[in-house]
């Protein structure tokens, strides 16, 4: 009986494994998905309206300021002016990119290009290819390059998560 049970379990295991190996994950683009009238479409439209309600000049302000340029508008408050400056701008780029890919909305496309152009202005002003919104980030990276590295739980050389801030842009 034990032998029969073992053989049966083995056959079932092999069969399941064989069946599963024939399936492959296939990727698709967001533009290949169209939402029908549903709570999902409603949520997407709510997101779209929120994204367009944000001021790109306020979101690009930390990057322009750190590049020595005069921002067109003041930064948003809270995290955008207390040491984590620029991180919402990084999230905003992702939101714009994904919303454009999902909807093809031209207002989103123009907003994305505007943000990228403002970041390009900041990058050109710095002259090294760097873009950053963290206050004092240019000095921070000079310190790192010189080997002066003071890492903390959420900080690097006294700056609040500058690597996180960079990864949001790239």
What are the functions of these language-model segments?
Residues 1-21:
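Bacterial Sec-dependent N-terminal signal peptides
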Residues 20-88, 110-151:
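Low-complexity, Ser/Thr/Pro/Gly-enriched N-terminal "stalk/linker" regions
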Residues 92:
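Aromatic-residue-lined binding/catalytic grooves and analogous aromatic/hydrophobic interfacial grooves
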Residues 162-167:
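Aromatic-lined, polymer-binding surfaces characteristic
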Residues 170:
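Conserved small/polar residues in nucleotide/adenosyl-binding loops
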